[in-house]
């Protein structure tokens, strides 16, 4: 039986912004703010928060920690940086590693509310991959001010020097690295980088693909330095989802991504192409959003007796499509709809360009004015079942 799920909404302005970006990319069905465990519930009747935001999609889990620590501009930059870094990054990492361990050890003890009355609806097992993201705030303007003293025109994102661990980052203002190289990689994103990534890579497949590729090149020590997250993103997009190809670099070599890659990318045809893909695939996004909202509100019509996992599995197939594939599917749907006469029943089968062998069946079914809407829906369901069997 499907049950209404009310997700958390964040406790701070920065958390609310993070949730907004995440909902645009992952939709509510896979994005859960303020997830709790039942630790301490027996004593206080309130659970303990595990993460600020938990994204669970297919076999990937992304744990977000959000910190809104003020950077003291009145202090010496090195002193101010160290204080900010300890509270924003090191404390976030501690929270992330703790959340990762708890989720791995006790996935059945996760809840979407602090009263621990509604379990996290997606089942987690030991086959899931974990990605950790530390979201920092209030650092973009100080970073610009600091780097402008070296050279005017620097970007607002932190510099990535990946060989630096947490202790070494403390000694290098506005630089972040692979802070705990012996643990799960932590993506450290300032507010500028977060907005950029979740705007440019606003599908689950595209965003997770970027995290995987970045983790690969850093942990293989192929990428040593990047002038900013936007420069790494530019390399990823222009490299067709590969930041640094193994074919162009030796086994013992590391590369640097210089400043200016993102600005250069925005002048290319590829950038305009990606914008067109987004505009042309809004239909598919809306389709997923509508399904997601209906499932979370338990308003699915005839199928409310079916459990959450079955609904999620079906809609997940729609959401697994990349931006390019969504454009292609949307284009085919709208083209068929445009050429279909209102009184005719027709269909079109379209193959996913992401997953060869995975097909979508679009059925265009006119409403007989003699039928009630309820009867029309029943008839429509029977026809789609029949078409699917033939397909």
Protein language model annotation of sequence segments:
Residues 1-50, 55-391:
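Intrinsically disordered, low-complexity Ser/Thr/Pro/Gly-rich regulatory segments
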